[in-house]
Amino acid sequence: MTATQPPVALGGNFLVSPLDEATLFTRERFTDDHRDIEKMVRDFASERVRPNRDALESRNQELALTLLREMGELGLLGIDVPEAYGGMELDKITTAIVAESMGRSYSASFSVVYSVQTGIGMLPVLWFGTPAQKERYLPRLVTGEWIGAYALTEPSAGSDALSGKCGATLSEDGRYYLLNGEKQFITNAAWADLFTVFAQVNGSQFSAFLVERTTPGLTVGAEEKKMGVKGSSTCPVVLKEARVPVENLLYEVGKGATIAFNALNLGRFKLAASDLGGSKAVFEEAVRYAKGRRQFAQAIANFDVIKGKVADMAVRIFAADSMIYRTIGLIQQAVDRLDPAAADYYVQMGEATERYAMEASMAKVVGSETLGMVTDHGVQILGGYGFIEEFPMAGPYRDTRIDRIWEGTNEINRQIVAGTVMKRAILEELPIRTQIRAIDAFLDDEPEAAGGALVAERAALEAGKRLALSIL
């Protein structure tokens, strides 16, 4: 960070500081390049993915991987990856734009395949891999030649991921780690060539390994029969004396939590952005139907109850949109302060996202619950037709339910939000305790509101912050 640059706000700073319009990122600040990429991805989603939705939902592996590799040819699998490894290394704002635009494809299954490939299936290697690991795996992942998967969850370790029983012991000759255990609900598993597997070294050191599909001792189980996202692959992965070369240890022994949670932070954010795109697509279908469906000699869009649902959907979508792009703007500011020439640049990048783990969890909760609400309203607006598979609500209604479970359940993400606030208050990283000590005066004084538009609304927002802090 140079002397002329102001410090980047820590996650949660919005609770103790007024809005800073100079650093508040919104979609209105997209560059021309951002808009060009947005159009390209939307066109791909509408022309290549959506027309093939039915085939993709039948778990057509050949079609899904063909489309994924087409995205690779467009450079869309390597947005975060340096050119040296075949990527484009665009900014983090672009990752949000692409995720949102793919969410409009009306194929949650394909969006899941894409999201895992470019997120938790690739970022651990990019952020924490050795030069040799990056050279071996990233060029294959960014083209779609190889498919990535992320093996963290176990039958007895879901939300409590660090309690996993999968073990790793060093072989007598010191050349291999022998992995034993079972992983559950692994997305992309049946198609994956590379698994990021988490295991306890010597029973207590949570670590990560890059495990190739051809590794002796690794077996992919049968496909799960799921409620939704039926076109994606979800299988258990069993490891029995799986021989993983010591060179495939990712980062360091005992650093698995750092890898897991940094990858999940951005994964949660990307899921939120994808859900935002899905919400907008469902909203458009619901409004289109309401304007065309006539009952009692008029379009049902004229009825106040339908207008109320449309308004509720629009409010939630706007709130999610604002939160998501404000958060990615903060992450981008933090990344911009890093030195790309630093040997640990990508480790620092992962750590930069951790600064906003709270906001990523908030975005995940708001994004997934917005899509759930919007889809539910969409079904209701379509009435009986909303329950019929040929109409555009039944599939999304099933598909969206998983978004409140994976990438950390929404209950766990709410705990992360509350825990982060408490932790940063105790460590005095945020001046929350200082303000709480003066709580009487803090509540008695009227909050000052800046001039200009929305004066009353800004004052109400600041008052709301004071009220929230008073509860602490």
Identify what each model region corresponds to.
Residues 1-115, 128, 132-136, 140, ...:
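Amphipathic, small/basic residue-rich leader segments at the start of a protein or domain
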Residues 27-30, 219-321, 361, 402-406, ...:
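Glycine-rich beta->alpha junctions and the first turn(s) of the following alpha-helix
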Residues 144-152:
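A short, Trp-centered hydrophobic/proline-enriched beta-strand micro-motif
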Residues 175-220:
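A short core secondary-structure module
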Residues 50-58, 295, 318-366, 379-382:
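C-terminal helix-coil-helix/basic helical segment that borders enzyme active sites and/or dimer interfaces
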Residues 166-170:
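A structural signal for short hydrophobic beta-strand segments in well-ordered beta-sheet cores
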Residues 157-158, 184-190, 266, 402-407:
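Glycine-rich phosphate/pyrophosphate-binding beta-alpha loops
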